[in-house]
Design a protein with these regions (language model features):
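Surface-exposed cap/loop segments at beta↔alpha junctions
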Residues: 1-60
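Well-ordered beta-strand positions in beta-sheet-rich domains
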Residues: 1-6, 20, 38, 118, ...
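Short, compositionally biased
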Residues: 6-13, 39, 110-113, 225-236
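Short beta-strand-centered interaction patches in the first periplasmic/extracellular domains
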Residues: 18-21, 25-29, 63-130
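Solvent-exposed, acidic/flexible segments
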Residues: 39-47, 75-83, 205, 219
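Polar, S/T/G-rich
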Residues: 44-55, 79-87, 91, 132, ...
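An acidic/polar, Gly/Ser/Thr-rich interaction patch typically located in mid-to-C-terminal regions
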Residues: 126-250
């Protein structure tokens, strides 16, 4: 099974008569994606925030991040839905969030990219494919500037080196907090610079966040991370899946 889904739209057309059903994976409690909230979260971890938000939505939090969760001194949820706020917060710190099997799943995408391939894709298993590489927007390091809450002095934190430095500024609790944020920003900017899209015969064992090994495409072959999967079922084409993938640098 692919998990639990809620039908959000359906349509019919003719002739011949055909129908289309669209469904999304989301908690049964619609407030998770519709109710805007304003709250100041203080002295709390991302995991603790997720536990409270998941509980409010009537589902569980699945936390798959190594290490002890760090404490955030304060973060504002300002007229945002729980879904929007929590996804943005996770992204800020280099974590990914998805709703799957009636759970909010939080994981470290960079750590997942180091896992072994869940399947091998060859040209014979692809109904169609397309490849794209974009060098613009990739970085060798980063610099984050913030004002110290204690001294009110401007502090710069740098990671990496080279000529392509991503520069950001904003709020940070400490140097360690600023470093987490800029590392996450660099990883996010570099992810997906090489993309592969493929349509394959349906394989329900594959899920987004897994890696696959692509073979038989010459220099385009390699290990790819699955960003998204779209499942398609039709009377003429059977069960197929559209995979959007990003190359994993090895």
């Amino acid at each position: 099974p692919c998990g639990f889904f809620i039908v959000d739209s359906f349509s019919f057309s003719g002739w011949p008569v055909s129908g289309s059903i669209s469904a999304i994976s989301t908690p049964l409690d619609s407030s998770f994606t519709t109710t805007q909230r304003t709250k100041t979260w203080e002295n709390v971890t991302i995991k603790e925030i997720g536990t409270e938000i998941a509980g409010r939505a009537g589902i569980a939090l699945a936390w798959d991040v190594e290490g002890t969760p760090f404490t955030i001194k304060s973060v504002e949820q300002s007229e945002q839905t729980d879904c929007e706020f929590y996804m943005n917060l996770c992204n800020t710190y280099g974590l990914a969030m998805k709703v799957y099997a009636q759970k909010i799943v939080v994981y470290d995408r960079e750590a997942y990219k180091k896992k072994g391939a869940a399947a091998v894709l060859s040209p014979s298993s692809m109904k169609s494919w397309s490849w794209q590489q974009d060098q613009a927007g990739t970085y060798t390091g980063g610099e984050f500037t913030y004002t110290s809450p204690a001294t009110e002095k401007e502090i710069k934190v740098t990671v990496g080196k080279g000529s392509r430095i991503l520069k950001q500024s904003g709020k940070a609790d400490s140097k360690a907090d600023a470093e987490r944020k800029i590392k996450a920003a660099v990883a996010k900017a570099n992810h997906g610079k090489t993309k592969l899209s493929a349509t394959i015969v349906g394989n329900a064992s594959l899920v987004a966040s897994q890696c696959v090994r692509v073979v038989g495409l010459g220099k385009l072959s390699g290990k790819y991370y699955i960003d998204t999967i779209t499942h398609n079922v039709s009377g003429s084409g059977g069960y197929t899946m559209d995979l959007e993938m990003s190359l994993v640098e090895e």
